[in-house]
Design a protein with these regions (language model features):
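Short hydrophobic alpha-helices and adjacent helix-cap/hinge residues
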Residues: 1-265
């Protein structure tokens, strides 16, 4: 009887911990991660289990959620989304789009560890271009409205939105506020432009999450995280929303349209 009893016991599946800042409804790209995982032969519920933890847009929930998923030991690897490297390039694009904008604002989250370096990089690029950059901060959903309302007082003619999970999860709110205050804004993800944002420039989030899924599958197959180099996102996308440009009374330069990966009309 013992062999039969053993045979009847379900096989214990390996488990992946999936921690996201957003809520499930705001994270459709999870399917892209699962697709990348599937490329390595793993299918959720069949030969791998996934423990999801959602911060619901709240930074204060992340430490407890991460601790809930923590396992002893191990190393780190992953995909870099070029958070810092692209801010200066976005300033160049904004200046090309609105050449008369001698004063712009940079929206940052003061609770993010990379914020100070992002500010330094943008300020250095602004000095070279002769542009004044005001730093405006929002560390929670409730602060976003008041922060964008302050742009008129600062006489900012453009807005740089930094890459941050909070801003990504509130992209519809940010896009609507930029439209309300008639401020040309450049965003870090194509999802912002799809939501009505004027222009976005940054790595493809779907391509990055696909690679994360592939890495997760490789680790499940026995690869050591330390042996998997942290990859930099190589697919950068420039997305322009002509409908929003028209609403703002802007003409997108041909030099930008010619380089755009996607033009939303």
């Amino acid at each position: 009887m013992l062999p039969d009893a053993i045979a009847e016991q379900p096989t214990k599946l390996p488990v992946i911990g999936y921690l996201a800042f957003a809520s499930p409804g705001l994270a459709p790209t999870t399917a892209v991660f699962l697709g990348g995982l599937g490329e390595t032969g793993y299918v959720e519920g069949q030969n791998v289990a996934i423990e999801y933890r959602w911060a619901e847009g709240r930074y204060d929930r992340l430490p407890a959620l991460a601790a809930d998923l923590a396992r002893p030991g191990g190393n780190l690897t992953g995909v870099s989304l070029l958070t810092l490297e692209l801010m200066a390039k976005r300033l160049e694009l904004l200046s090309e789009l609105v050449p008369q904008a001698s004063v712009v604002a940079q929206l940052v989250n003061p609770n993010t560890s990379t914020t100070e370096r992002m500010i330094r990089d943008v300020q250095e690029a602004a000095r070279v271009k002769g542009v004044q950059v005001h730093i405006v901060k929002a560390g929670s959903e409730s602060e976003i409205d008041a922060t964008l309302a302050s742009l008129a007082q600062l006489q900012a003619r453009g807005l740089l939105v930094s890459r941050d999970p909070l801003f990504n999860s509130r992209r519809e709110q940010l896009v609507a506020l930029a439209a309300r205050h008639a401020v040309p804004a450049i965003y870090p993800w194509g999802e912002f432009a799809a939501a009505g944002g004027l222009i976005s420039y940054g790595p493809s989030l779907t391509a990055a999450l696909r690679q994360v899924g592939i890495y997760a599958g490789k680790i499940l197959k026995g690869a050591k995280p330390a042996d998997l180099p942290v990859e930099q996102a190589t697919k950068l996308e420039l997305v322009v929303n002509l409908k929003t440009a028209k609403a703002l009374g802007l003409t997108i330069p041909q030099s930008i349209l010619a380089r755009a990966d996607e033009v939303i009309e």
